[in-house]
Amino acid sequence: MKEITNDMLAQLRASYDADGQAQVLHSALAKTDMAELAYVPGAGARLKGAFSVEVKTRGITAQQKSGRCWLFAALNILREKVAETCHLDQFELSQNYLSFYDKLEKANNFLEMVIENAQEPIKGQLMQYVLRGMTDGGYWSEAVDLIEKYGVVPKQVQPETYQSNHTDRFVVAMNRLLRKDAMELRELVQAGKDPYPRKAVMMAEVYKAACIAFGQPVQSFDFAYRDKENNYHEERDLTPQAFYQKYVGLSLRDYVAVINEPTADKPLDTPIQFHAVENMAGRDMKALNLSQAALEDLCVKQLKHGQAIWFACDAGAFGARKEGIWDPASVQYEALLGGFSTDMPKGKRLEYNSSSATHAMLLTGVHFDKDGQPDRWKIENSWGKDVGDQGYFVCSEAYFKEFVYEAVIDRRHFSPEQLALLEKEPVVINAWDEDY
């Protein structure tokens, strides 16, 4: 391997000293936030305006300083059904209620994987994946599992706490506890002893800690509200499951996660099964890998049908948070830092860890150009009303093609050929083989 030499440094210095533009850029960056300078107002302005197709939604939510975007997006789809059923202008489901059970399920899954793989080497790829511990993050299928098992409740029944809005310290504390528990469980299994009496005690500790941080989940509640005509309604002693069945009633298994991840290990037109990615023990995440054009076509169909779309993208790529825009032409960090290029094919970008799905939101609209093709997309974010257009964002078609990786589609919009693909044998990918 070659190290940096004095000759090399001299050449680098001479190259920079001869570049007057680079020195001007340094002067600007020395005193100004890079995000302010990277944004190109003229390019961003072309993304403003109404949308050809737009789905009405009931306002912006705020996940605060937590990583629960995936759950907010899922519940924001469900709340539209409640609002329609009850004739409400505004409504929100409790994110805290399901977040509690998400943490509990992730802790249980962690301990079960430790027990199941107790003979695996501690420094092996599998155990190092397990020992990453829990996070706030998740996917559509994890939200579905939680909703089907635990139901949902209105936000006023289990409101946010400071800890549910600021989860970092709780997650750090739980991971320290779980890693200590992992050490003990591995030692018990390796000594030929039953680990489950100790696991029960460990789960009780996690449950108590989660109750202290987030509040103990309700088992039943009364639902009282006034509809848009000011008529009073009340139903007593509802369980979260009964509330879901009566006021939401969606068959969530009719929705399919469609991904566009054109990597060497994920063939297109093929179901992909991500082993051990789920929050619940023994569950795998499944998705159908389609071309970008097919994914986009399904999104347009669903929006035209009046249905918002849960989707996942790389929120760190070409984003202007304050302006509420994702667009390579509008956010030019490369030009600001000397004019280099980060262009890579979409599949290679994933393979080289240059990009991944980091944020989930809702697609709620699309605008078509003069040829009838999408050129910008409306997004309902969960970052509150102080950013974007009162909390709504927009992304360009260029961004959508390169940095949108997943969309959840009602199977009614699939072609017969696409439905048949769901019956194919899936390609199985272990979570520890990729960055999940």
Model-derived segments and spans:
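Conserved catalytic-core surface of thiol
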Residues: D369-Y436
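Short His-Asn-centered micro-motif
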Residues: F72, F311-D314, T364
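Generic recognition of flexible, low-complexity loop/linker segments
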Residues: M285, L295-K301, K348-N353, L362-D369, ...
